[in-house]
Amino acid sequence: MALVLGSAALHPFRDLLIKGQSFPESAYLGVTGSWVIFAALQTVWLDQTLTLPIEVWPLVAGSALGLFIYYLCVMLTLKAGDLSIYYPIIRSSPLAIVAIGYVFLERYYSPLTLVGISLTLLGAIMIQYRRGAGLLQRPKLILTATAAMIGSAIYGLSDSVAMETISPAPFLFWVYTVLTLAFMAFFTLTRPAQRPLSQQLLGCWGSAPLHVLASGALSYASYVLILFAFQAGGEVAVVSAIRQVSIPFSVLLGALVLKEQRVLTRLAWSLLLASGVALIIAGA
């Protein structure tokens, strides 16, 4: 429990620190690349090996795919959206974990779980509601935030299985090496014609290098705590649900640091969303 709560306290700072970067592609590339370095240092510090068993490599691929979807959709969402509106949707991965279990594992859920799903969806919609602007004011951002949530569920499931046989640092080293290379290729191919490649991939380092490094360090520490929780026997959906205490925290950060508006209303709906996630797990 303490590991997950510690992770929840650290997690929102990653997106807060790189929100509003002039070159968000380079910022996210910088964060993922920093994880490779941190994982290598942790591996050396703990006197571990970077060699992985053959059976773990499909989980590396699954985790990297989920992370690619997650990071890309978070970047697209936060380019145009308030942190406190969309972060709660992005972090509602227990909803996707329960859905994947139902569709692919033939798991059936109690009425309590269905109530939790309803509360989660209501909270997610109402967080971004503005009176007079229409209920679904920015449906494209709802879509990218939801895709990020699904990506989070994919890598969470992959990582929880991997932690049954491997230590966090070597696993993260290879996952983030694959992810960083994938992002380098993707951002190179999608670079605007008028933007130099060096600016596309490294632009953030000239304007906010400390923000990128701090974001990488805090997010790495946050997720290593989650992997330790998986190693200790934590069930992925339960761990993800407890981590949802970061949702109201993100709303407060958005108001205090980014000066986002309507914080009390959004905080109320964020609490409803988090309550719905808790009910999903309680009834699963």
Task: Report the location of each language-model feature.
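Alpha-helical transmembrane segments of compact multi-pass small-molecule transporters, enriched
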Residues: 34-39, 89-103, 178-182, 222, ...
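Hydrophobic transmembrane alpha-helices of multi-pass small-molecule transport proteins
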Residues: 36-39, 98-102, 112-131, 265-284
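Structural motif at transmembrane-helix junctions in multi-pass transporters
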Residues: 23-27, 73-89, 108, 164-170, ...
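Structural signature of hydrophobic alpha-helical transmembrane segments
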Residues: 1-8, 51-67, 106-122, 169-181, ...
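Membrane-embedded alpha-helical core segments of multi-pass
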Residues: 10, 14, 66-73, 93-100, ...
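Membrane-interface interhelical linkers
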Residues: 1-62, 71-81, 129-144, 177-232, ...
